[in-house]
Amino acid sequence: MHFTLYSRSYCHLCQDMLDALLLLQPPDKLFTVEVIDIDTSPDTSLLARFDELVPVLFGDLAQPELCHYFLDEAAVRRCLP
């Protein structure tokens, strides 16, 4: 499983969400997390899309977001195999 977390470097909620997400990782089923800083990303559309919503977590970029601001543990667990 792969998660994408849209974030900002100075955002304490972003770090909190990442920390909480990593705590959900089962030892036998590892997942990856790509953290994308919307302020430094070459994709300038991310800033317009996620500016006031960060942190925003996706499990599959083709699907709606899993959560923003705070980790939705139930939504994340539904994504895990």
Give each language-model segment a name.
Residues M1-L24:
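Local sequence-structure signature of Cys/Sec-based thiol-disulfide redox active-site neighborhoods
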Residues D16-D19, S45-R49, L71:
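Generic recognition of short, well-ordered alpha-helical segments
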Residues F58-P81:
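Non-catalytic, surface beta->alpha helical segment in thiol-disulfide oxidoreductase systems
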Residues L47-F58:
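Structural micro-motif
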Residues L30-D43:
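Thiol-based oxidoreductase modules, predominantly thioredoxin-like and allied folds used
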Residues L18-L21, K29-F31, L66:
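Non-catalytic interaction surface on structured domains
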